[in-house]
Structures are given as structure tokens and as C-alpha cells.
């Protein structure tokens, strides 16, 4: 066999070995993925993380492996905790979901996961930004619209508490009409854009999901903050509070209807809180 023939024979042999190793790695990766899923379902998140990491190393193109890894990491993120260790885990999970988006730019679920992680570590700017990315892909997503409305309410409410507490005033939840102008007028200017946006997105959420009782409850809350923005306009304040009361009542009725539907058994049988069938 001449040199050229030997070269091609060796090349074919090596190619076969590489293909064989690649196929073996794919099988091993799927095995690690399955083990990770089992650990995740059992609540063993650290073990699941190890399996999902091995799966992605063995087969970087394995569908869902990185998504599952991001979800497992997310379980270790403590909501509301901003310690360096917790933020490190949160950012690891976020980076994994961003890697998924690099391969699938319109993966709305990864966008939602990123937004949710940012929300859980109180990074509201990024949480809102990513929820708006969700709405760019799916304009009718009620949860994204709801979350943006909640963020706007949280900001406006905190602004109000800061202003009132600095003046030694307790929030009355009814527009604080007795508070002085030098407190309420600057607050109204500060909060007006937040209230407008919050109302817009919470209304979108309810329109897209008519039984969204949580969004209805936040409409109640944001109308109460709108009463502060309408300081000095008695008719507007009265209307804001009436709207708040209406949304409270609607939220309660809708929640009851949702619970009744949840407890409804086959054939229209309803199970009450005591377990009795009707």
C-alpha cells in the first residue's frame, strides 16, 4: 500500500472512530439528561445540576439540556436575597438561558425564566426589560403584562411610602387628601408615568385572561395609587377609589369562581372546602 492509500485508510478509520465516539457521547448525554430529570422531580436540585451539566458537556446540542440546567440552577436562587452567593447562582442560571436564546432567539420561555430570576433578586429594571421582550414575541402574554404592571405598582408604592414617611404621615390608602401640597404634588409628578404604564399593562393582562384575579387585585391597588396622583382633584380621586372598590369586588368574585371551577369533579359535581359533594 502506497503512502496516499495508507493516508486515506487511516483517515477513514479515524473518521469512523470519531463518529462512533460522537454517537456514544450522545447516548451518554441522554442518560445524564434522564438522570437529571429524575433528580429534579425528586427535589434533589444539586444532583440534577450535576447531571444536566454532564449532559451539556457530552452533547452541547442536546435539546432541552441547557434549559433543564437553567431551571435546576434557578431552584437554588433564594427570592429576595441579594448576597453575593445568591446573586452568583442567579447569574449562572441567567447566563444558561441566554445561551439557549443564542441558539433559539425567539424562545419565549427562556425570556420568561430570565425575567423571573431578575424579579426574584429584586432587579426590577432587568425584570421589566425582559418581560417587554416577551411581549415583543407574544403580545398577548397575560403574565408578562401582569408582571410589568406589578413592577410599576411596586415602584410607585415605594415612592409614596418614602415621601409620606419623610413627612411623618401614614398612608391612608384613599388618596391622602389631607397631606400637604409640598409632599403630594412632587409625588404626583414622580408617580404619574408609573401609574399610567401600570394601568395599561394590568388592563392588558385582564383583557388577555378575563379570569385573572391577581391582575384585578393589582388594578385595585394601582387605582388607589392613582388617587394620590390625582391629588387636588376631588372628583378624580372619588372616581379612582370607586374603580379600586369595583376591582376588589371583581377580584373576589373571580377568585371564588376560579376556586369552584378548580374543585369541580367529573360530571359537574362540585366539592366544597369540607370535601362534601354537591
Predicted features along the sequence, with ranges:
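Short coil turns that delineate tetratricopeptide repeat
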Residues: 60, 105, 139-140, 210, ...
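Bacterial signal peptide processing site
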Residues: 25-27
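Conserved structural position within tetratricopeptide repeats
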Residues: 56-57, 95-102, 133-136, 204-207, ...
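Alpha-helical segment of the N-proximal tetratricopeptide repeat
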Residues: 30-54, 58, 79-83, 184
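Short coil/linker segments at helix-helix boundaries
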Residues: 29, 46, 74-99, 151-204, ...
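C-terminal motif of bacterial Sec signal peptides marking the signal peptidase cleavage site
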Residues: 20-23
Amino acid at each position: 500500500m502506497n503512502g496516499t492509500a495508507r493516508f486515506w485508510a487511516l483517515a477513514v478509520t479515524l473518521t469512523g472512530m470519531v463518529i462512533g465516539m460522537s454517537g456514544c457521547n450522545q447516548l451518554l448525554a441522554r442518560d445524564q439528561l434522564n438522570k437529571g430529570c429524575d433528580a429534579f422531580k425528586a427535589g434533589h436540585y444539586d444532583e440534577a445540576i450535576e447531571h444536566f451539566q454532564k449532559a451539556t458537556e457530552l452533547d452541547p446540542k442536546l435539546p432541552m439540556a441547557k434549559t433543564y440546567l437553567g431551571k435546576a440552577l434557578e431552584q437554588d436562587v433564594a427570592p429576595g436575597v441579594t448576597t453575593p452567593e445568591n446573586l452568583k447562582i442567579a447569574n449562572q442560571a441567567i447566563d444558561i438561558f441566554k445561551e439557549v436564546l443564542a441558539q433559539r432567539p425567539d424562545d419565549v420561555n427562556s425570556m420568561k425564566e430570565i425575567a423571573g430570576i431578575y424579579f426574584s433578586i429584586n432587579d426590577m429594571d432587568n425584570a421589566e426589560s425582559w418581560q417587554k421582550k416577551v411581549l415583543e414575541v407574544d403580545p398577548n402574554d397575560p403574565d408578562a403584562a401582569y408582571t410589568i404592571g406589578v413592577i410599576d405598582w411596586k415602584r410607585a408604592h415605594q415612592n409614596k411610602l418614602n415621601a409620606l414617611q419623610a413627612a411623618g404621615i401614614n398612608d391612608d390608602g384613599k388618596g391622602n387628601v389631607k397631606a400637604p401640597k409640598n409632599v403630594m404634588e412632587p409625588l404626583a409628578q414622580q408617580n404619574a408615568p408609573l401609574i399610567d404604564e401600570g394601568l395599561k399593562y394590568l388592563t392588558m393582562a385582564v383583557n388577555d385572561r378575563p379570569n385573572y384575579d391577581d391582575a384585578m387585585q393589582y388594578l385595585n391597588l394601582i387605582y388607589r395609587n392613582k388617587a394620590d396622583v390625582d391629588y387636588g382633584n376631588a372628583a378624580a380621586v372619588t372616581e379612582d377609589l370607586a374603580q379600586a372598590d369595583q376591582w376588589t369586588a371583581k377580584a373576589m368574585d373571580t377568585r371564588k369562581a376560579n376556586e369552584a371551577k378548580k374543585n369541580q369533579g367529573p360530571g359537574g359535581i362540585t366539592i366544597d372546602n369540607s370535601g362534601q359533594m354537591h
